[in-house]
């Protein structure tokens, strides 16, 4: 078998005829600037060819069902293994997917519970078990010798009727006695039963005494009783008193609770699946949640009075007056005021306003002629009103409007567990499958490791437990110990989802595979990095080849082989700058990566931090969504704030689910519902909020940077104003490739034509009419400065910038695109070919070129994903530019280069999952570095100057919030007080720092200019 992976002549995307040899069974890191061609080489060339060759080996029939891979543009590749790619894009958004189902741990748990679980009755909680006739006889013979009992066969249990035929039938079969409603009767003289009452009838099969010789007769009697009653037998011990619970013993051949008359189906693994009708909760169909109206959203601000519109759905629009009259009539009927805050209303009034009032109320109003009119009506209440209007809504807009007052709440039937009550009553060591799935992965591993089983169960569970424990161990190893198995897959971050798939791959135990990974360290705190690296090394040691596209310094330093692609991005990249060991990379003068790793280049620390103004800040009060523990957090305005903390500590919940969603709802009129919190102060100080993420800027090849940023509209107008266009009567629409008129109709403005090949991959060929130009001949005859519209779309942005420098509207857009480091991207480059980092910078550029009010909040979630040290340096310049205009930038980040340049840091923690959700430290990076309990502070200490930390170390007050909060968890009042005082100390000290630094700040700004 070849010991090298040989690539020759790779020309995919911007690769310039790349040839390289890579060692097999090694950890290889591909690095380089964003857009330099790393993914083109790793994913679109090496992985695509490995996958394609495997698929080619299948029959043509099987191939048509598999996603076909295009043959990459490469001369040849040798030494390829079957390839598995683990990227971030293919995360499941299915609401039925959970961490347990993705990792298959839940499948093994279902098997475990189906085979060794102990069923209980969901009503009375008694254990249920099935017994064979022999087992029943053996149990009876264990009782004290001489105990007298009768064997009864229960034929009727609590059913109405006279049962005349049944008594006659029993007599003909030779039975002489029966027990009716607890009274023994002779069948020769049956009682007359009342037809309308419920009766219980048991026929007496035999009367016996416990002794060794009675075994044969007892077995026959029990078998007869079981046969008559469909698998049930009752033993009545006549010597015991009537009220003794041991007097009657019921046995069953099936899973059946005789006390509640519930019978159970045979337990199978599918009974525990919430994706199967056999196990799913019938009310929520296994989703676990339902949309319910939330009173908190109907009255978002309890300080408002009813006259000021406290009840939000009734406070605006043309129905405002109508509801005002209704509320006034209710106030008269119940005797409460409408001009005091909603919070001060009596409980009875609140209940009636929200949930309705049964008795009719008298409503008075004046019609348009000034006459007074009176009518009576029931008062519906805001909650039932929203529910009714939501269910009756005919348009999406109307439905969305009322969904804004609803929250997803756990299904009341299954309490969010997704399963039937019968299934939840099956336990292993007193825990149901839902309770095991709700544990964190580390707790679940501990629980399964400590299982105490009898010999039979141990034998059955042995292999299942081995599989589950291995999988759980791998999940812990990749730093996901804080996740629970029932966590919905849609709520995972890209990095978490990728590491879950990584753990699943290790669990599969394959050898000789080529794994291609895309930045597995995303979303991982420096503290957990070593665990991930150990996992990658273990995968390699099993005999696999790993190609990791990565910018993380620790991972690059551990690699056996490093490939640096560059030297620039886009047109300026696509070459192999370095392929070899770390030592050679550090000495390579041409490699940007080498210069940053060796310390020749670095991202500088700002000389001075922007001061924080205590009077201008956004404060979230009482944040308690997911794992947040009722915390108050302030974000100063007009500075760059970094929110840090280990994975799962609650950063995204705080910033995205609560702060951003609240601001989007208040300022942008969005309909989404923020996470649970008491209130947000300071939102009147900002007028817009923008969320810049790494999702694609468009999902169709027709979307491109020119159309996304809006610069294409100006370009089309410019072309329409040329003399030639005016002579021909062309309008700006003529120069669009999306509408009929100017576009080439043969390819509908795509420039390529798709030819379907059934079981071969679809082939895209350039359109033979326009030859890929997208426009018809007449449109292309219009020129500006000698270039057609197609030539302009094909220009790199830096070239277009000089071309259009005389046109301010266009130049402004292009300058911002160039400032964020996208000069190499072509104006008309399809959005689908842009990397995540590039898409994010296109969004940033389109925001940057808007006229700034200086009151905008920008929220960025891990903006350094996919960015090289050099790209991060450019990004920080852009973000500083936004802040210098007076805006506020809040970033969720693990990258220390970004954290060290921030003006303010909010560090969440101390751990992930249930161990997080508190603010461990807040202050400048120097202040956070001085906090011993902060994991982020520990790593900041290593990169900040020691004297800067010692100067700032005096501010330690806010750190106590986390410690105090856990101690004072029972006393809420105490809790809020702590936070307030700590904030005050921080504020005073920050103000003091501000005074000292103000003059110095001016000089740094001047130097910059």
Curated annotation (Swiss-Prot):
Domain ABC transporter span(s) in chain numbering: 314-592, 612-941
ZnF (C4-type) intervals: 744-770
Molecular function GO terms recorded: ATP binding; ATP hydrolysis activity; DNA binding; excinuclease ABC activity; zinc ion binding
GO biological process: nucleotide-excision repair; SOS response
Gene3D superfamilies attached to this UniProt entry: ABC transporter ATPase domain-like, ABC transporter ATPase like domain, ATP-grasp fold, A domain, P-loop containing nucleotide triphosphate hydrolases
InterPro entries (alphabetical): ABC_transporter-like_ATP-bd, ABC_transporter-like_CS, ATP_grasp_subdomain_1, P-loop_NTPase, UvrA, UvrA_DNA-bd, UvrA_inter
Keyword presence, Amino-acid biosynthesis: no
Main location: cytoplasm
Signal peptide: none
Residue ranges, compositional bias (Low complexity): 964-997
One of the Pfam families matching this protein, by short name: UvrA_inter
Keywords noted in UniProt: ATP-binding, Cytoplasm, DNA damage, DNA excision, DNA repair, DNA-binding, Excision nuclease, Metal-binding, Nucleotide-binding, Repeat, SOS response, Zinc, Zinc-finger
Disordered, as annotated region: 956-1009
Binding annotation for ATP: 32-39, 645-652
GO CC annotations, alphabetized: cytoplasm; excinuclease repair complex
Cysteines paired by S-S bonds: none
Subcellular location field: Cytoplasm
Similarity field: Belongs to the ABC transporter superfamily. UvrA family.
Purpose of the protein: The UvrABC repair system catalyzes the recognition and processing of DNA lesions. UvrA is an ATPase and a DNA-binding protein. A damage recognition complex composed of 2 UvrA and 2 UvrB subunits scans DNA for abnormalities. When the presence of a lesion has been verified by UvrB, the UvrA molecules dissociate.
Quaternary state and interactors: Forms a heterotetramer with UvrB during the search for lesions.
PANTHER family: UVRABC SYSTEM PROTEIN A
The protein, known as: UvrABC system protein A
Species in which this protein is naturally found: Streptomyces avermitilis (strain ATCC 31267 / DSM 46492 / JCM 5070 / NBRC 14893 / NCIMB 12804 / NRRL 8165 / MA-4680)
Gene, per the UniProt record: uvrA
């Amino acid at each position: 078998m070849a010991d090298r992976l040989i690539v020759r002549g790779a020309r995919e995307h911007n690769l310039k005829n790349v040839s390289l040899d890579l060692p097999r069974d090694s950890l290889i890191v591909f690095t380089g600037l964003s857009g330099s061609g790393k993914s083109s080489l790793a994913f679109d060339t090496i992985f695509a060819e490995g996958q394609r060759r495997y698929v080619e080996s299948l029959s043509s029939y099987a191939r048509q069902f598999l996603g076909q891979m295009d043959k990459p543009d490469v001369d040849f590749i040798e030494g390829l293994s079957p390839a598995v790619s683990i990227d971030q894009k293919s995360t499941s958004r299915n609401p039925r997917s959970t961490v347990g189902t993705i990792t298959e741990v839940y499948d093994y748990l279902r098997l475990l519970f189906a085979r060794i679980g102990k069923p209980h009755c969901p009503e009375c909680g008694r254990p249920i078990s099935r017994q064979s006739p022999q087992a029943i006889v053996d149990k009876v013979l264990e009782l004290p010798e001489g105990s007298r009992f009768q064997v009864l066969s229960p034929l009727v249990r609590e059913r109405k009727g006279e049962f005349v035929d049944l008594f006659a039938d029993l007599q003909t079969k030779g039975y002489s006695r029966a027990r009716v409603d607890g009274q023994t009767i002779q069948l020769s003289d049956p009682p007359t039963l009342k037809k309308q009452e419920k009766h219980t009838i048991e026929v007496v099969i035999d009367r016996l005494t416990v002794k060794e010789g009675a075994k044969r007769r007892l077995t026959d009697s029990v078998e007869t009783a079981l046969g008559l009653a469909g698998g049930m037998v009752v033993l009545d011990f006549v010597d015991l008193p009537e009220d003794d619970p041991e007097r009657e013993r019921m046995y069953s051949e099936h899973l059946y609770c005789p006390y509640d008359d519930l019978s159970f189906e045979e337990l199978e693994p599918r009974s525990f699946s919430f994706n199967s009708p056999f196990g799913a909760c019938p009310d929520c169909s296994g989703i676990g949640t339902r949309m319910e109206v939330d009173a908190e959203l109907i009255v978002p601000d309890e300080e408002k009075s009813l006259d000021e519109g406290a009840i939000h759905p009734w406070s605006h629009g043309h129905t405002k007056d109508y509801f005002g009259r209704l509320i006034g009539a209710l106030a008269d009927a119940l005797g409460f005021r409408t001009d005091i805050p909603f919070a001060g209303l009596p409980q009875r009034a609140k209940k009636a306003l929200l949930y309705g009032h049964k008795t009719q109320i008298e409503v008075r109003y004046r019609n348009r002629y000034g006459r007074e009119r009176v009518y009576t009506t029931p008062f519906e209440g805001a909650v039932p009103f929203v529910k009714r209007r939501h269910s009756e809504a005919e348009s999406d807009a109307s439905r969305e409007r009322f969904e804004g007052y609803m929250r997803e709440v756990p299904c009341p039937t299954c309490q969010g567990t997704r399963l039937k009550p019968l299934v939840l009553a099956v336990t292993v060591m007193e825990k149901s499958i839902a309770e095991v799935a709700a544990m964190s992965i580390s707790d679940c591993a501990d629980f399964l490791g400590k299982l105490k089983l009898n010999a039979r169960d141990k034998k059955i569970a042995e292999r299942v437990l081995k599989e589950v424990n291995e999988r759980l161990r791998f999940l812990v190893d990749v730093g996901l110990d804080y996740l629970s198995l029932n966590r919905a897959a849609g709520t995972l971050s890209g990095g978490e989802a990728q590491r879950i798939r990584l753990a699943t791959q290790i669990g599969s135990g394959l050898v000789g595979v080529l794994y291609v990974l895309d930045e597995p360290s995303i979303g991982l705190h420096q503290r957990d990095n070593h665990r991930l690296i150990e996992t990658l090394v273990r995968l390699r040691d099993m005999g696999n080849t790993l190609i990791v596209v990565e910018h993380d310094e620790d991972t690059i330093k551990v690699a056996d082989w490093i490939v640096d692609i560059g030297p620039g991005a886009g047109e300026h990249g696509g070459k192999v700058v370095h392929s070899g060991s770390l030592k050679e990379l550090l000495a390579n003068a041409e490699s940007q990566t080498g210069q940053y790793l060796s310390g020749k280049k670095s991202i500088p620390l700002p000389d001075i931090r922007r001061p924080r103004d205590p009077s201008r800040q956004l404060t979230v009060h009482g944040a308690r969504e997911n794992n947040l523990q009722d915390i108050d957090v302030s974000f100063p305005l007009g500075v760059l704030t970094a929110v840090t903390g280990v994975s799962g500590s609650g950063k995204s919940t705080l910033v995205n689910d609560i702060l951003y969603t609240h601001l989007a709802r208040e300022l942008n009129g969005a309909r989404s519902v923020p996470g649970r919190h008491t209130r947000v102060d300071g939102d009147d100080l900002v007028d817009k909020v923008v969320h810049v993420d790494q999702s694609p800027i468009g999902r169709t090849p027709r979307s491109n940077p020119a159309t996304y940023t809006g610069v294409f509209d100006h370009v089309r107008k410019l072309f329409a104003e040329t003399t030639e266009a005016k002579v021909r009567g062309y309008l700006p629409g003529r120069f669009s490739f999306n509408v009929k008129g100017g576009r080439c109709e043969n390819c509908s403005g795509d420039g390529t034509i798709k030819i379907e090949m059934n079981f071969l991959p679809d082939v895209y060929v350039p359109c033979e009419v326009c030859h890929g130009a997208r426009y018809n001949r007449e449109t292309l005859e219009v020129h500006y400065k000698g270039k057609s519209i197609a030539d302009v779309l094909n220009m790199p942005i830096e070239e277009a910038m000089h071309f259009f420098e005389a046109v301010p509207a266009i130049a402004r857009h292009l300058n911002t695109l160039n400032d964020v480091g996208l000069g190499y991207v072509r104006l008309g480059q399809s959005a689908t070919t842009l990397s995540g980092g590039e898409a994010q910078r296109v969004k940033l550029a389109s925001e940057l070129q808007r006229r700034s009010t200086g009151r905008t909040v920008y929220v960025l979630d891990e903006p350094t994903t996919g960015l090289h040290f050099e790209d991060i340096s450019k990004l920080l310049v852009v973000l500083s530019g936004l802040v210098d205009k007076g805006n506020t930038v809040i970033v969720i980040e693990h990258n220390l280069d970004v954290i060290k340049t921030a003006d303010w840091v909010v560090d969440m923690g101390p751990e992930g999952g249930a161990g997080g959700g508190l603010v461990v430290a807040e202050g400048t990076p120097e202040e956070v570095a001085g906090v011993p309990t902060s994991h982020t502070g520990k790593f900041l200490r290593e990169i900040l100057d020691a004297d800067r930390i010692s100067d700032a170390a005096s501010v330690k007050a806010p750190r106590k919030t986390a410690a105090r909060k856990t101690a004072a968890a029972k006393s809420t009042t105490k809790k809020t007080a702590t936070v307030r005082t700590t904030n005050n100390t921080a504020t005073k000290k920050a103000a003091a720092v501000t005074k000292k630094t103000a003059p110095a700040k001016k000089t740094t700004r001047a130097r910059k200019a």
